[in-house]
Amino acid sequence: MTKSELIESLVEKNHSISVKSVENAVKEILEHMSQALESGDRIEIRGFGSFSLHFRQPRVGRNPKTGAQVKLDAKCVPHFKAGKELRERVDFNA
């Protein structure tokens, strides 16, 4: 599901809210989440999951086209860990 599909879905479920209002709300939520991660904060949404940053050590990688070694610098990457409730909802074996 893309961001625009999410917005359309939310508008379809609640006709009293305008598309522009939903679009602004979704954009604002995503912007606040991005800013929180940018400042090093952890985001926890109970029942859904948590977003945090993971530090990646510098390492040597390979260019898949040429096979040449490439030095990759250390960096922080966003990480999502699904909450228990979300894991249970998507578990098709349960």
Swiss-Prot record:
- Keywords assigned: DNA recombination, DNA-binding, Transcription, Transcription regulation, Translation regulation
**Gene Ontology terms, cellular component aspect?**
chromosome; cytosol
Its BP terms in the Gene Ontology are: DNA recombination; regulation of DNA-templated transcription; regulation of translation
Keyword Metal-binding among record annotations: no
Please give the PROSITE patterns that the UniProt record associates with this protein: HISTONE_LIKE (PS00045)
Gene Ontology MF term list: DNA binding; structural constituent of chromatin
Q: Which domain of life is it from?
A: Bacteria
- Quaternary structure note: Heterodimer of an alpha and a beta chain.
* PANTHER family assigned to the protein according to its UniProt record, in alphabetical order: DNA-BINDING PROTEIN HU, INTEGRATION HOST FACTOR SUBUNIT BETA
Against HAMAP family, the record matches this protein to:
IHF_beta
Family assignment from sequence similarity: Belongs to the bacterial histone-like protein family.
Question: In UniProt terms, what function does this protein have?
Answer: This protein is one of the two subunits of integration host factor, a specific DNA-binding protein that functions in genetic recombination as well as in transcriptional and translational control.
Record protein name field? Integration host factor subunit beta
* Lineage of the organism: Bacteria, Pseudomonadati, Pseudomonadota, Gammaproteobacteria, Pasteurellales
